[in-house]
Amino acid sequence: IRRPPRSTPLYSSAASDVYKRQIIDSAGALDKKRLVRNVVHQPCIFEYVYFSRPDSTLDEISVHKSRLRMGDFLGDKILNEYKNIDVDVVIPVPDTSRTSAMQVAYKLGVKYREGFMKNRYIGRTFIMQGQNTRKKSVAQKLNPIEIEFKNKNVLLVDDSIVRGHTSKKIIQMVRKHGAKKVYFASASPPIRYQNVFGIDMPATKELVAHNRTIRQIKNYIGADELIYQDLESLRLSASIGNPKITEYEDSVFTGNYCDSYVTKDYLNNLEKRRKDVSR
């Protein structure tokens, strides 16, 4: 069987979203028969934060524009609540955070720079098994460009912070390359709870924000200051694009799961299965 190389594009045109209670049959037709009871449509907010490509449109919401708005809200929060920090340059942790980071720099009126070379043969570190593997992979995945960090107060912007190991390692690398101060901003709120709807996220106890304050997280990752996006601002970043959607699946931030089968026993069993035995 001959397959096209991975870089070969599959051209398509946007048609519509496939919603709950809908399927596409083998002939390519959209079947709108009622398959399950009527439920409130709650898109996963993490799609807009991280998983979806920026050129995607989900539920009539542009992922790119939603990330621009995340940067707007994050920049406003820094200006209003963190007036003590003096930022020389904003640098994204590639790749997903680029859009938000550019908007943060615009809001703050400072330079935006690319500060990392990325090895694209290393996968997503937050789903890798084993802390040693993750630490090694971060060092292999990102290589700092020293001239962008040396003798500067740097604001690093990432889409989210999961275990905190990646953020901690990146901050250490940046300091090693001469940064005077390292501030860290997350385009999403603290991730405090595990995901049960398809994202292979760590067990709750492995999440850096679980049972930690913002100050404790800041100290753990070694940042001079840590700024998180507010949950309401994140929701607005998406809902401005489609006001018809009023609820989102945001349980990783709130612990409020939208299905009744997600009980405490279910979560405990899931925790056991996901426990990272390689640590």
Q: What spans do the regions from the language model cover?
A:
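Single conserved hydrophobic/aromatic residue that forms the stacking wall/gate
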Residues: 1-15, 19
